[in-house]
């Protein structure tokens, strides 16, 4: 492999603040700058990527530190580690500025921001960058509602609370209205205007920004508008893929739509000449096909376990907090939307193929039970659904 890696600044004790540079065979460089985001109860530090292709491009922006602490810890009634509590409110911004300076740039040099998707840890620091640089923002049209709406975070609270209650999860202490007011105060000014909506695959070409070095591939499933960016010219025998949250290592992503996600993983496994996949969290993936096969097997096993756990009527939260369902212990007394949603999407895919069904509602909480048939028969129907791209689930 001709691709070269160089650590310029190592990560700190919270595994952020690091800068690493990847050099392609033709000498062009991709710089990874890692910014703070909580792990275990959050996705972990967020990698931002810097590409100099005639215009300086930043892929994803990270999240303001004070907001990351609230979203992933305080607003979930969780205890905050002293090391995290002591971080300055603009810690992630300082990490970005230090990372840019290490390779000869500053925030004002950024001309284009490309968002891999519309989740909070990927765009909420955008306005901080835009105010200093005047950068334009590009994102897939299918995630613009999440990114552009000043009330998107508040809306997720009002939509999420009844859903998580129906799963059987304990809700945070505050009322929806209390959270709404605080969230509006913190986030309503952080929505972004999408100057350059992406609507098709192929070489980056949006409103005057053109690049044969950056190829866009729509990769839905983690979110409707998730994209991957393949970095490298046609003559490059080895290419880098910036995959956002579609493919992570060693953790596994939390899909928004499991059926769509499994179709995307199939597609990514067919790509050629990808030497390394650089995700937005965690470690690089050096074996693209191997990782996609692992992810397919991982979700098959989780579907199987979900199916077996629902032999008797179970709530979504009972399944999610079952020991062994995740690699980490999920405390059933805690509020954990990511864990609840992960179990929910597996139940919903099983429900689509009639492997499980909703059998009762007790005090607003839904219970599911499996069909009693061998799981292999159920999974065969799931595989048929994945393979038949002509089927859209309403």
Where do the model's predicted regions map?
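Core dinuclear metal-dependent hydrolase active-site scaffold
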Residues: 32, 50, 197-236, 240
């Amino acid at each position: 492999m001709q691709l070269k890696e160089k650590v310029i600044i190592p990560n700190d004790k919270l595994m952020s603040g690091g800068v690493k540079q990847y050099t392609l065979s033709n000498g062009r460089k991709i710089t990874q700058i890692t910014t703070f985001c909580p792990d275990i109860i959050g996705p972990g530090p967020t990698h931002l990527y810097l590409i100099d292709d005639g215009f300086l491009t930043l892929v994803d922006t990270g999240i303001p530190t004070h907001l990351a602490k609230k979203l992933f810890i305080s607003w979930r009634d969780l205890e905050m580690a002293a090391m995290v509590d002591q971080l300055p409110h603009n810690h992630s911004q300082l990490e970005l500025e230090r990372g840019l300076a290490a390779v000869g740039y500053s925030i004002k040099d950024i001309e284009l921001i490309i968002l891999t998707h519309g989740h909070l840890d990927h765009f909420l620091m955008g306005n901080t960058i835009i105010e200093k640089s005047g950068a334009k923002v590009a994102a897939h049209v299918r995630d613009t509602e999440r990114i552009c709406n000043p009330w998107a975070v508040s809306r997720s609270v009002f939509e999420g609370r009844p859903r998580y209650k129906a799963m059987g999860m304990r809700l945070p202490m505050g009322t929806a209205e209390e959270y709404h007011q605080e969230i509006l105060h913190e986030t309503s000014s952080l929505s972004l205007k999408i100057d350059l909506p992406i609507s098709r695959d192929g070489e980056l070409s949006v409103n005057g920004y053109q690049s044969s070095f950056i190829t866009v591939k729509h990769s839905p499933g983690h979110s409707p508008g998730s994209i991957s960016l393949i970095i490298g010219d046609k003559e490059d025998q080895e290419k880098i893929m910036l995959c956002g949250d579609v493919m992570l290592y060693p953790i596994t992503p939390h899909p928004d739509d499991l059926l769509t996600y499994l179709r995307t993983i199939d597609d990514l496994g067919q790509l050629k000449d990808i030497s390394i996949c650089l995700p937005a969290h965690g470690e690089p993936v050096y074996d693209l096909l191997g990782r996609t096969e692992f992810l397919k097997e991982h979700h098959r096993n989780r579907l199987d376990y979900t199916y077996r756990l629902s032999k008797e009527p179970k709530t979504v939260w009972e399944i999610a907090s079952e020991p062994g369902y995740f690699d980490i212990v999920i405390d059933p007394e805690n509020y954990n939307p990511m864990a609840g949603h992960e179990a929910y999407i597996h139940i919903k895919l099983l429900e689509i193929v009639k492997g499980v069904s909703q059998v009762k509602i007790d005090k607003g909480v839904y219970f599911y039970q499996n069909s009693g048939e061998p799981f292999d028969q159920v999974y065969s129907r799931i595989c048929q659904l994945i393979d038949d791209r002509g089927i859209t689930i309403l």
